[in-house]
A protein has these predicted regions:
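A glycine-/small-polar-enriched, mobile loop at the entrance of the PLP active site in fold-type I
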Residues: 1-10, 179-182
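Short glycine-enriched loop/turn motifs at secondary-structure junctions
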Residues: 2-3, 19-20, 119-123
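Phosphate-binding glycine-rich loop
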Residues: 10-49, 62-66
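Structural signal for conserved beta-strand scaffold positions within catalytic alpha/beta enzyme cores
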Residues: 27, 72-74, 110-112
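Short alpha-helical
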Residues: 33, 57-58, 134
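PLP-dependent aminotransferase-like
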Residues: 39-101
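Active-site region of PLP-dependent enzymes
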Residues: 98-100, 104, 108-209
Length: 209
């Protein structure tokens, strides 16, 4: 249970859970780091992961940072639409998908609130949607330098983490903006998947490590 200024982050996560249908939600500073944490939890080091050849460049970066290798799948046309699996893992890149009841059971769905094209224009930020309680607790500590939700004067440090947490003021803004995804009668609004053009990343040697 969060306390102090970080309680607002927990409230925002609860609102995302209610809207998306995910049992657990962990917010982070951006969606690229959400993908990285999900891949690290799934221990993908040394494995081959297949992604669309046309996607945002940070996706192959995070796969490589997590210790895996990339296999690019051909894409018809020059655009990418909606969410896709980082196969064969249960990690999904959902940067182009944010809608009511979107959560797919058994997955870690990584959503994005960054940039002018997203449905949720929070300027910055991302989240991991999951139904895995063990992963939920790991993500919460991993994003916060391995810390538990207490003062670092009282913590027992036994985990190496990263500084990926969402700033409380951004979570507060997100909580206020959640109203846009509900109708006046309280029912949820559904958003169409986004479709955006991306370069063919399979042409670049840097991703073939």
């Amino acid at each position: 249970m969060a306390n102090g200024i970080y309680k607002i982050t927990e409230d925002f996560e609860k609102s995302l859970s209610d809207y998306t249908g995910a049992p657990y939600v962990v917010t982070v500073d951006n969606q690229s780091n959400a993908l990285f944490l999900a891949l690290m939890f799934e221990n993908v080091k040394g494995k081959e992961i297949t992604i669309p050849a046309r996607t945002y460049p940070s996706v192959p970066c995070e796969i490589i940072h997590a210790g895996a290798k990339i296999k690019f799948a051909p894409v018809e046309g020059k655009t990418l639409k909606g969410a896709y699996q980082l196969a064969p893992t249960n990690v999904w890149d959902s940067a182009l998908c944010f809608t009511a009841d979107m959560y797919k059971p058994g997955t870690h769905m990584c959503v994005s609130f960054t940039g002018p094209y997203k449905h949720f224009k929070l300027s910055k930020g991302g989240a991991i949607l999951t139904d895995n309680l063990e992963a939920y607790h790991w993500f919460k500590r991993a994003r916060y330098s391995g810390r538990r939700e207490c003062s670092y004067h009282d913590d027992n440090f036994d985990m190496l983490g990263w500084n990926f947490y969402m700033m409380p003021e951004l979570a507060a803004r997100g909580l206020l903006l959640m109203n846009q995804f509900y109708n006046l009668d309280g029912t949820k609004k559904y958003n169409a998947d986004l479709e955006l053009p991306y370069p063919d990343l399979s042409k670049f040697e840097i991703y073939k490590q």
